[in-house]
């Protein structure tokens, strides 16, 4: 009971000191007064971590969030360095998470050293990499482009999502080939960004001899819902790969250009269900899409096309009737 009371008293003391510094511009770092509570007491460090993490999640004000980082750097840097070098596995992992959350760039050299010396590939190694990415470590970013290590696409995506956007665009511009996991991940994250500055890249990669790259380029154009070189799309309607035909149909549905209607009509009779589905959905979103689908349902020579058109016209009727 006494131990719990002491812990709650410490929690109150820590929270009060943190909030006073964060929300009072007249209080300097030297006036926070936490140093004497931290000496040799790991519980106080843990309470400080919890307090800073809570405020960081609750606060949107950029200057106040920066003060959270200042507090973390001032009070936790040496403690974290000691945990990284001497702590048990669970402590090291938690420390890496907190360093990432608090963006403690002063510890980047220590973590880079761990990256170089940690030979075993495990969860800790991957978190070291994620933390370096969150700290915007240019040594890691340079290595990705120059060496393209054989890491998973998933890990690469986690790295690129942590990059500053300008740094990400720079790395994209520096990559010679997108045919490896690092390139695949870059294109996936570029699509997530929906940044129109990357549209020329997607358009250029439509001519790649790699199916994986072409698919990612098509998905990027689909996400942006625009293209400047419309002539580049048409050939994908007759691709031997069904996924490219499907993506053509979906993009055509976003662009809604009349030049694609006859092609979509043909794709309604495609041998692949996903392509037929994509073509029907695309036509459905054209201005006269329902009329076009009704015509296909009545006149298309392919029974699969007629059936798909019937389903989409029926879905319109179902919505109009309130689903009854």
Indicate where each model-derived feature is located.
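N-terminal topogenic membrane-targeting module
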Residues: 1-86, 93
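Amphipathic alpha-helical scaffolding segments comprising HEAT/armadillo-like alpha-solenoid repeats
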Residues: 35-39, 71-84, 104-116, 137-147, ...
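Membrane-interacting alpha-helical segments
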Residues: 49-61, 244, 274-275, 302-306
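Long, mid-chain structured domain cores
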Residues: 50, 59, 66-131, 136-138
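Structural detector for internal amphipathic alpha-helices that build alpha-solenoid repeat scaffolds
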Residues: 62-71, 93-102, 124-135, 153-165, ...
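Short inter-helical turns and helix N-cap capping residues of alpha-solenoid HEAT/ARM repeat scaffolds
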Residues: 87-88, 117-121, 148-152, 178-180, ...
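Extended hydrophobic secondary-structure segments
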Residues: 267, 275-276
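Alpha-helical oligomerization segments
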Residues: 293-295, 300-308, 315
């Amino acid at each position: 009971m006494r131990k719990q009371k002491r812990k709650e008293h410490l929690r109150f003391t820590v929270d009060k000191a943190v909030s006073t510094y964060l929300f009072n511009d007249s209080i300097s770092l030297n006036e926070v007064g936490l140093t004497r509570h931290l000496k040799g007491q790991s519980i106080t460090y843990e309470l400080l971590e919890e307090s800073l993490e809570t405020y960081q999640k609750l606060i949107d004000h950029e200057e106040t969030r920066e003060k959270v980082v200042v507090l973390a750097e001032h009070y936790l840097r040496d403690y974290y360095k000691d945990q990284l070098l001497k702590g048990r596995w669970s402590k090291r992992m938690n420390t890496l998470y907190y360093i990432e959350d608090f963006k403690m760039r002063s510890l980047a050299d220590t973590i880079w050293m761990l990256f170089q010396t940690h030979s075993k590939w495990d969860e800790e190694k991957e978190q070291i990499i994620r933390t370096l990415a969150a700290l915007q470590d240019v040594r890691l970013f340079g290595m990705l482009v120059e060496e393209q290590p054989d890491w998973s696409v998933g890990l690469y995506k986690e790295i690129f999502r942590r990059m500053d956007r300008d740094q990400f665009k720079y790395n994209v511009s520096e990559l010679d080939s997108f045919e490896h996991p690092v390139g695949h991940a870059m294109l996936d994250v570029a699509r997530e960004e929906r940044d129109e500055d990357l549209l020329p890249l997607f358009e250029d990669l439509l001519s790649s001899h790699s199916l994986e790259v072409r698919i990612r380029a098509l998905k990027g154009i689909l996400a942006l819902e625009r293209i400047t070189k419309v002539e580049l799309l048409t050939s994908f309607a007759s691709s031997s790969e069904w996924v490219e035909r499907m993506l053509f149909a979906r993009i055509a549905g976003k662009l809604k250009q009349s030049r694609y209607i006859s092609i979509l009509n043909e794709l309604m009779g495609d041998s692949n269900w996903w392509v037929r589905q994509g073509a029907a959905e695309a036509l459905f979103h054209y201005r006269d899409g329902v009329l076009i689908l009704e015509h296909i349902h009545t006149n298309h020579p392919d029974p699969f096309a007629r059936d798909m058109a019937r389903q989409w016209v029926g879905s319109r009727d179902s919505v109009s009737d309130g689903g009854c």
